[in-house]
């Protein structure tokens, strides 16, 4: 069976490739119906990644966020026509300690293998999760992005102490919005404060208990824990600002992606006894938990 794959050949140039798809008795075939463009896809397209990385990974189909309909399932897991969310993480082994999205052997669509920008996507059944009936398909296309925040919050609940009266979220973009919204849902008794740079964006956080411009934070502000959702060149400033305002023995969850190292105030990390952890991507259990939320 021929599959049409739309690959990025070089920055700003796509090409159509026709690849043979082997049909077997253990893999499901899904036709993508809604896709979401991630900032990582934009960096590949714009050539904003290192030249060595581009040479190594291109040509490659982009997109790792999306949903689709099952068109073939020899395993009987799904009925034909079932709407599913596609999981981009492709583990090749299981580990009792390390989650599937942190195994160095795992592949990831639109990073170490072709993404979802193709006519058909083929994988074993557990790489697809059935969508709830009636869900808005456009909203469902963002499931992967939301699952990353869900994954980070669940790790935070494991790592942090139980005093969670005030949680700060640095970042007024999509990731900050999604993370703070989930925090409000999963920790309804906690106050969620948002720290950003754009007043128009901060005004969208109507569910938050408070919003602050990072240049106008009250001197007496104190938080128990924090999530960094800034990334890029401003990540260092955001993390250091968190360190300034967080209570001793607080936990800092880092979610923002930076291409360059971000220097932080390690002296105060030690003095306050802070715990800092990073989270990346997500696994099947995160999708299942999110869709049940």
Language-model region placement:
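Mid-domain Rossmann-like dinucleotide-binding core that forms the NAD(H)/NADP(H) cofactor-binding site
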Residues: 133-216
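Short glycine-/small-residue-rich Rossmann-like dinucleotide-binding loops
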Residues: 36, 74, 89, 230-234, ...
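Glycine-rich cofactor phosphate-binding loops and adjacent beta1-alpha1 units
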Residues: 158-164, 186-187, 202-273
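C-terminal substrate-binding/catalytic core of Rossmann-like NAD(P)-dependent dehydrogenases/reductases
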Residues: 259-293
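Glycine-rich beta-strand-centered segment in the early N-terminal region that forms part
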Residues: 22-35, 50-93, 132-134
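Residue-level marker of beta-strand positions
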Residues: 65-67, 82-83, 120, 172, ...
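Short Gly/Pro-enriched turn/cap motifs at secondary-structure boundaries
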Residues: 20, 57-64, 109-113, 119
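NAD(P)H dinucleotide-binding glycine-rich loop of Rossmann-like/cofactor-binding domains
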Residues: 88-166
